[in-house]
């Protein structure tokens, strides 16, 4: 394997790689048919679990007052494909990935997923080199600041409710206007949000968007997701 690439990866990950062939596998897509060392798929499977565990551990320590529901939402936001792909781009990993000819013009979600997979495969390599302690510096370097930024202020309630609902089983919140009143220049909307398996809530506002947000906030508070919310967090 190219020594400058190894040196660059060791600087980026703060880890000394012990198995060059395994590292090479982590950077090889399954579309490379003539590859003798294999591809990153098995490593990605392992790395996904290691990442989830270490992010859960980090969140548990960073947010001692957060409920289980809030921790789950934060976890989902930090281990999803987009976050991992963003970190891959930050590290310059796309230029190091070995792909087959037909994959070189990949775009959109499939490209995002591939970049995320390589991050997870890289995590697996570090874990196999030296266990969880070998991965923690890498997690701190790229995920800790992101985790803290998530706490700088509440995200949009609808976005947070959607992520929480996904954690609960993949269902999506459904919003519908149940009442509209008032004059055209000063309308009042009442919107109901429902999630399969949970009681609905109704929000009220001067626009559909505002009413939807208020309904979403009610669910987040009721389910304990925003249990630690301060009085100004939603302003």
Curated annotation (Swiss-Prot):
Catalytic residue list: 48, 120
SMART domains for the chain: DSRM, RIBOc
Subcellular locations according to the entry: Cytoplasm
Location of the RNase III domain: 6-131
PROSITE patterns: DS_RBD, RNASE_3_1, RNASE_3_2
Catalytic reaction list: Endonucleolytic cleavage to 5'-phosphomonoester
Domain of life: Bacteria
DRBM domain segment(s): 156-225
Keyword Hydrolase listed: yes
UniProt cross-references to Gene3D superfamilies, sorted A to Z: 3.30.160.20, Ribonuclease III domain (1.10.1520.10)
Hydrolase as UniProt keyword: yes
CDD domains cross-referenced by the UniProt entry: DSRM_RNAse_III_family (cd10845), RIBOc (cd00593)
NCBIfam families: RNaseIII
Subunit structure: Homodimer.
Function comment: Digests double-stranded RNA. Involved in the processing of primary rRNA transcript to yield the immediate precursors to the large and small rRNAs (23S and 16S). Processes some mRNAs, and tRNAs when they are encoded in the rRNA operon. Processes pre-crRNA and tracrRNA of type II CRISPR loci if present in the organism.
Family: Belongs to the ribonuclease III family.
Identification of the protein by name: Ribonuclease 3
Organism in which the protein naturally occurs: Bartonella quintana (strain Toulouse) (Rochalimaea quintana)
């Amino acid at each position: 394997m190219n020594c400058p690439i190894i040196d660059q990866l060791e600087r980026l990950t703060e880890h000394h790689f012990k198995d060059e062939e395994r590292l090479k596998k982590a950077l090889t897509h399954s579309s490379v048919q003539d590859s003798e060392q294999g591809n990153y798929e098995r490593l990605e499977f392992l790395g996904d679990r290691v990442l989830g565990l270490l992010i859960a551990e980090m969140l548990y320590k960073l947010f001692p007052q957060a409920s289980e529901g809030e921790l789950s939402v934060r976890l989902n936001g930090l281990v999803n494909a987009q976050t991992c792909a963003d970190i891959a781009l930050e590290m310059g990993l796309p230029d190091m990935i070995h792909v087959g000819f037909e994959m070189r013009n990949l775009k959109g979600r499939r490209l995002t997923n591939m970049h995320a997979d390589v991050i997870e495969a890289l995590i697996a390599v570090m874990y196999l080199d030296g266990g969880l302690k070998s991965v923690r510096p890498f997690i701190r370097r790229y995920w800790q600041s992101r985790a803290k930024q998530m706490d700088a202020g509440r995200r949009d309630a609808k976005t947070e409710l959607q992520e929480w609902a996904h954690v609960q089983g993949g269902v999506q919140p459904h919003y519908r206007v149940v009442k509209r009143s008032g004059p055209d220049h000063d309308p009042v909307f009442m919107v109901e949000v429902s999630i399969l398996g949970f009681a609905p809530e109704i929000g009220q506002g001067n626009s559909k968007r505002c009413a939807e947000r208020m309904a979403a906030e009610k669910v987040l508070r009721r389910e304990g997701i925003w249990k630690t919310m301060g009085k100004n967090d939603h302003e």
